[in-house]
Each structure stands twice: as structure tokens, then as C-alpha cells.
Amino acid sequence: MAKLTVRDLNVRGKRVFVRVDYNVPLEERDGQMVITDDTRIRETLPTLRLLVEQGGRLILASHLGRPKGKREPSMSLRPVAARLADLLGRPVAFVDDCIGPKVEQTAAALKDGDILLLENVRFYPEEEQNDPAFAEKLAALAEVYVNDAFGSAHRAHASTEGVARVIARRGGPCAAGLLMERELKFLGEELENPARPFVVILGGAKVSDKIKVIDRLLEKADTLLIGGAMAYTFRLAQGYQTGKSLVEPDKVDVARAALDKAAARKVQFLLPVDDVVATPVETGQVDKKGRPVIAYQNPRVNTDPNCPPDAAGLDIGPATVKAYSDVIARARTILWNGPMGLFENPQFAAGTNAIAHAVAQATQTRGALSIIGGGDSVKAVNKAGLASQVTFMSTGGGASLEFLEGRELPGVAALSDKPSSGGSGS
């Protein structure tokens, strides 16, 4: 069932609770927290402008980081309010809490077209607990609910699900924002009956992260192209040696079942024909997250399906790039989720970069519909400077994966269904 969207609403004179995803990267400079990438703020502007033009009184809510249910000044949304005001060219009020008398008074004083940004909802543990009383307090601020935070829609939290349920119970409309609407369109409707050939490119580290997606897409796709470390679990399932590559021995049966399903359904299931391997060496150092830093020596192209015993596979090789690019060039629908190798390291970024160019070229020259399914694939396309040359880039990480698995996302399920006979929706 299609969901109600902001286009269906009549919000003039009404207070609208808008859940956005302003979980932006911040860093400290001269004692101030500075936003280093405002993409997530920019992505909400069409929804906010539409609601402002329609005379809504906007109350924006978001999380930022993981403050673990307590006030953490470095994760305040105050800098976001200032940046949003700059981008919109109009004032954005900020209140240093998200519930309580001060918030209620500020919300009550809003006039048509005004915007108020609440403080980080995760400063309260009740947000992630989806606490009913906390959801009631947030919902008391507004008469209409809009969710434009697809990246958080897979979490049943107070601001993503609880508030919508309360407002709906009171008879208020709960709608998808324009960004959410696009996510549901491209990850949902467009993949239900895709133009063929439908080519799915899957990468990343673990088969366990993607197996449900693989299983579902084997029922829809014509070809699956596999890259990243997950390819080595499939190689192990085929009886090859994987050296020091990242593998999941406990997922070999799952990988074998996927290969069998592909064969039974006559889906082309392509694994790398060559790879870039290198010898991992411990440096004795740790990164910011306390993980050991590994250096890689003697990077080289390996054309043997077996990985050398002292080496790890870290990227797809040139013959694989050529084979995959040829398949992509003929595609009419392309879904890409996950990099082809350890692309954060320039030594092993060539495969991912080449696939990004192949997807962009198919989109531009053949008119293919290309969907970049969130997370690292989006980073890779941005890094290659090709964001404007693909059809759609998802803002979700875990949300995109869960949606592609066919799971109902709590934040989407809580939205009102579009009335089948038309109507204003409010």
C-alpha cells in the first residue's frame, strides 16, 4: 500500500513534527563544533521548503551520534540549526531540550512558516527505548507527523515510530517526506518490476550481512556480480583456498545454498576471475577505534582462483573489472550495494572506482536506472565525483539493507496509508 506523503497534506496553521536525520559529522575547531559534511541537512530542504510554503509550523527532531541517553555537549544540534538557517535563508529557532515546558512554550508560539529545531532526542534514554510516555510528550507538540529520516526508519524509536503512532491514534495524518518518498520509490516500487536485464552488484566484507538480500534478489535479478571480501566465502564454498583473506567459514553452507539457488533459477552469479592480493603485516599500531592497523606489502594481481597462503584478497582484478563492466553496460536496471574491495586504501580502490564509472556510464549512455544502495557504495560514488551521473543514491545504511531484504521498517509501517479514493489526507 502506498504511503501518505507531504504532497497529500494540508498543514496551514498546523504544527508539524518532522523527524529528520541530522546525524552529521562534527569536529572541534577553536572550541566550537563544526559540521564537516552537511549533505544530510541539504537532503531535507525540499521537504522543509514545501511545508513552509504550505504554511506549516515546523518542529524538527533528530538524533546525532550516540550520547547513550545523557546530555553530551559535543553532540548538540545547535550547530545544525545555524547551518540549516543559512541553507534555507530564513531563521531557525533552537531550543536546548526536546521535551518540557520551555519546548512546549516555544512550539506554541510558532507562526505559519516558522521552524524550530529541538535538541538531540537521544539525550534521553527513552528515545531508543521507544518509551510511550516520552513519545506522548513529543507528540503533544504537534498535530501532524512527517518522517523524512529513512536512514533511521529501521529503528523502532520514540521519534521514528512512537510519535507517529500517538498522532495517528489522535486522528492526525502521518506522512513520508519527499526524501523518504524517493527512498520507498527507488528501493521498493522500481525494483518490483525492474526493466531488464536487472543487474545487482554486491560487495562488502561479510556474506552474513547480505545473505537475506542475496536470497531475495535471486528471485528478481538476471545477474549478480559479487565483489569485496564476501567473494572469498563463496570461493571457499567452491573448494578454493582463500589464504589470509577475510572469510566466514561458518557461512560456507549459506554461500553454497545461494550458488545452488542461482543455478536452479538460471540467474547468472559471477565471482571475480582475478583479484589484487597483498601480504598483511601487523604494524603494532591501533586506529582511533582501538583496532590494530594492518599494512599490506607486495600488492599484485592474482589470476589463480586460489589465493596464495601468505596473501589476502583486497580488490577485484582488471579482468574482473572488464567482465563486470561489460555486464553493467548491457543493464537496464542496476542496484549496487557494497564496495569491491578495501577501497579506503588507495592501493585497493581501483576496482570499486571502475565499477562506479561503469554504473555512471550505463546510466548516462544507455539510460539505465541506477540505484546506489547506501553506505560505502555511496561514499565510493561521491569519491569518484559521479553522484550526479547515477539515478538515485540511498541515504540509508542498515535501513536500505533491511528494506531490500523485504522487511517492513517500523518508521515506514507507522505512516498513514494513502487513501485509495484520493482526498487531502488530513
Task: Show the residue positions of the predicted features.
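Active-site loop-to-helix "anion-binding N-cap" substructures in soluble metabolic enzymes
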Residues: 1-426
